[in-house]
């Protein structure tokens, strides 16, 4: 055997020894003797390790390689020692999401395997090259391999258990240990949790691409080839190693069977904090009254203190609180029904005041926030509780101030609640443009519609200015009748009131007189334009009609009689003559003769009796000056039968004196314009 081969065999033996020492000392903290001199092999491969006689004795089968015999694989296990646990201990494991998983109870399992290292010389892959037989080249490769190995040991999850600090006063219940095993023999997992057993249920029966269980991971170091085989190092380890131990006896003492003092101090405090958090969820300005509890003597006193606590206020409340009152059982039980319902802060203060005066008990260490004096102005958010705040008058009592001194609340609201309150306080402008602004097209259409109505309004104003009276009657209507407003609809009438019958009868005569005077002025203006020589004397025309037209006189008399007895007025015959006069004046300017035919009874057919007084379309307004308004007007003109005018007809034959007298009477009758106001409908 050559010298180079001897050096290569020595490097292979040191490879196994250095690997075992490095893995053991990286996982287990030993108390080495500092006075012990370092041997030559401690600095081998530029990695410093301490000598371990026990480990060196166990590793003898792997450091006696002679180049001929077959070396078994070296298995180094890193495990969690559970032998120090008692039956009352329970081992749990946290997964990646922080969920606890129970592993075992104390005494059931002795070990939990965390890592398994495999160090071997694989003779199936032999390299006969010159570089593989060079000891210096092999040494350089082994230096790089151990540097990577040391780095890998510091990065594996099991290193977190080793570096985790623990209480030095109490011995650790679980420790990390290592063990050397012969890889050629089967490895048994009886009495321990093997590496192949998943603890977390989600990993069970799941394999990854490399045919490895999902709760495990594997790392391989690049092998180094020699003339005797390849040096390999492989590791398989658990991904989740966050193990911890719980003592069941401590849990029962702490949570299941607490002492009297602990129950009276811790449990009510937790309830008070929960009530405070619930009450603040109502609104940012919710009033909360907290009371610090003192230890009570006797179990009965403890039960009374728990039963006297108020439940959180429900819908419709403005605050909630937690009250505890020390004293006799009678005072405690009497406070419960008075404060058990949902009441406002004012009723709470009043109930406490009454209770203090009756039973003489006081509230200990009560925290009264300043919002109690102004609950109505405290909240600036609109809610359904505003009505309750407005109707509740809250006043602070001097006796209550003396017994309960205000203090700052020791319970701070959670951060998420504070952020929610800040979000509510941020004022943001509401975007109301899509709902309030109308389209431009609608605005333009409205403007065009109003412009088109202007011409109609002007024409209507001219017509109304001629039809309405210029001079109002001297006597104004001053009756303040409480009867229903007269209806101006021609289809539906209203029942006239008896209280205003007298005033209506007087107003009918005044209405006819005012209409006559207004028609005189219109008649004068129209005849002046046509050049007619017709006499427009109002009284003369009326007198002519009274002497020549007997029918008209009878109508006048019947009309006046109906004014006094039936409250149904008829139109004056003079209005008929006014219409004929107006029509005659318009026909005078034409060159052709127009034969106007009409019913002989057309004038008589128009009677006010068909229109009750309360349905007259003319509204009487007590105005000092004429008023023009844009209203819809409907008018009917009735024409009487008349013969051609001899003064304006060419080629007319002379008539007898009687005929000429009759025609002159007809001409006088035609001088007046009959403008029947009863058929005009003025609708506002």
From Swiss-Prot:
Keywords: Autophagy, Cytoplasm, Protein transport, Transport. Residues 395-410 have a biased composition (Basic and acidic residues). PANTHER family: AUTOPHAGY-RELATED PROTEIN 13, PTHR13430. InterPro entries: ATG13 (IPR040182), Atg13_N (IPR018731), HORMA_dom_sf (IPR036570). It comes from Kluyveromyces lactis (strain ATCC 8585 / CBS 2359 / DSM 70799 / NBRC 1267 / NRRL Y-1140 / WM37) (Yeast). GO terms for cellular component: Atg1/ULK1 kinase complex; cytosol; phagophore assembly site. Its main location: cytoplasm. Interacts with ATG1 to form the ATG1-ATG13 kinase complex. This is Autophagy-related protein 13. It holds the Pfam family ATG13. Residues 624-634 have a biased composition (Low complexity). Activates the ATG1 kinase in a nutritional condition dependent manner through the TOR pathway, leading to autophagy. Also involved in cytoplasm to vacuole transport (Cvt) and more specifically in Cvt vesicle formation. Seems to play a role in the switching machinery regulating the conversion between the Cvt pathway and autophagy. Finally, ATG13 is also required for glycogen storage during stationary phase. It is found in: Cytoplasm; Preautophagosomal structure. Residues 260-284, 394-414, 491-520, 532-559, 623-684 are annotated as: Disordered. GO terms for biological process: mitophagy; piecemeal microautophagy of the nucleus; protein localization to phagophore assembly site; protein transport. It comes from the Eukaryota. Disulfide bonds: none annotated. Residues 491-516, 654-665 have a biased composition (Polar residues).
